[in-house]
Swiss-Prot record:
Catalysed transformations (reactions): (S)-malate + NAD(+) = oxaloacetate + NADH + H(+)
Binding annotation for NAD(+): G11, A12, A13, G14, Q15, I16, G17, N107, Q114, V131, G132, N133
Gene3D superfamilies, sorted: Lactate dehydrogenase/glycoside hydrolase, family 4, C-terminal (3.90.110.10), NAD(P)-binding Rossmann-like Domain (3.40.50.720)
Protein known as: Malate dehydrogenase
Enzyme class: oxidoreductase
Coiled-coil ranges from the UniProt annotation: none
Gene that encodes the chain: mdh
Keyword Glycosyltransferase (UniProt): no
Organism of derivation: Xanthomonas oryzae pv. oryzae (strain PXO99A)
Length: 328
């Protein structure tokens, strides 16, 4: 049996956490031969800690063979001690009458503290996925608050947008989703992100040629993917938790175990590729192998695409400037 991998999850008793933990403990994220120790962080209030205790009791009651241990805490330094993987799910949700900039500042406090705790106690090669919104900028804040860790350790979740775009293309084509490759989602995890199927194929055939409908792309496909989260809240009365948890598992699984040459979308620190400001955490096409990701480089960007990429980059730069005074 392999040595256990330590996985931290913040916001562990929340909706996404609840949809995530049992799948991690069953081996869906890191492999069916990989034991895990779950290190679970929740808020220090009595209600959150009681809920966390209940979730841990349920995890015990599943008797997962791969669950080698659990820690439940309200202290980030305890939760992040010696971890290999961190899923930063917990974030301050937007309340009634709350401006986006207020939300940014509230979350900046959380992710500054968590970045500092990771810097202090996590393994030096820890893989960090930020799920809590605004995910790209929260990941940027955590990265900047952990100066002793490699910036490439920090990623934001664009995989939910990627998966949503895949399913919309499959519906349009009337083909199985599993045959679609080389889809890209550029930018911020927000309604400005740009799902781009110019390079995508379905069973090896060009999707752009098959659809050949720029009107559908601009007026249906892009807005449907961008507003899908809001549509789910409207339909369900709650935000998308199970699909977000599923995307987090996909993201980490591919990062750790490899994407087998397939393109996936990850929010990663820009190296200046595609004209994206260096350091901004931006959705790019990547391939993953041996625990490392590599950007897919030198894709042609047409005028239509450039307009969308510029818009989502402008939003990210505005978010970055809104929190830069907190990061020294």
């Amino acid at each position: 049996m392999k040595a256990p991998v330590r996985v931290a999850v913040t916001g562990a008793a929340g909706q996404i956490g609840y949809a995530l933990l049992f799948r991690i403990a069953s081996g869906e994220m890191l492999g069916k031969d990989q034991p895990v120790i779950l290190q679970l962080l929740e808020l220090s209030n009595e209600k959150a800690q009681a809920a966390l205790k209940g979730v841990m009791m349920e995890l015990e009651d599943c008797a997962f063979p791969l669950l080698a241990g659990m820690v439940g805490t309200d202290d980030a330094e305890v939760a992040f001690k010696d971890i290999d993987v961190a899923l930063l799910v917990g974030a301050r949700p937007r309340g009634p009458g709350m401006e986006r900039k207020d939300l940014l500042l509230e979350n900046a406090k959380i992710f500054t503290a968590q970045g500092a705790a990771l810097n202090k106690v996590a393994k030096r090669d820890v893989k960090v996925l930020v799920v809590g919104n605004p995910a790209n900028t929260n990941a940027y804040i955590a990265m900047k608050s952990a100066p002793d860790l490699n910036p490439n350790n920090f990623t934001a979740m664009l995989r939910l947008d990627h998966n949503r775009a895949l399913s919309q293309l499959a519906l349009k084509l009337g083909k199985p989703v599993g045959g679609i490759e080389k889809l890209v989602v550029w930018g911020n995890h927000s309604p400005t992100m740009y799902p781009d199927y110019r390079f995508a194929t379905s069973d090896g055939a060009s999707i752009g040629d098959a659809i050949n409908d720029q009107e559908w792309n601009a007026s249906t496909f892009i807005p449907t993917v961008g507003k899908r989260g809001a549509a789910i809240i409207e339909a369900r009365g709650l935000s998308s938790a199970a699909s977000a948890a599923n995307a987090a598992i996909d993201h980490v699984r591919d990062w750790v175990l490899g994407s087998n040459g397939k393109w996936v979308t990850m929010g990663v620190p820009s190296d200046g590729s595609y004209g994206i400001s260096e350091g901004v955490i931006f959705g790019f096409p990547v391939t993953t192998e041996n625990g490392q990701y590599s950007l897919v480089k030198d894709l042609p960007i047409d005028d239509f695409s450039q307009k969308y990429i510029d818009k989502t980059l402008a939003e990210l730069e505005e978010e970055r400037s809104g929190v830069s005074h907190l990061l020294g």
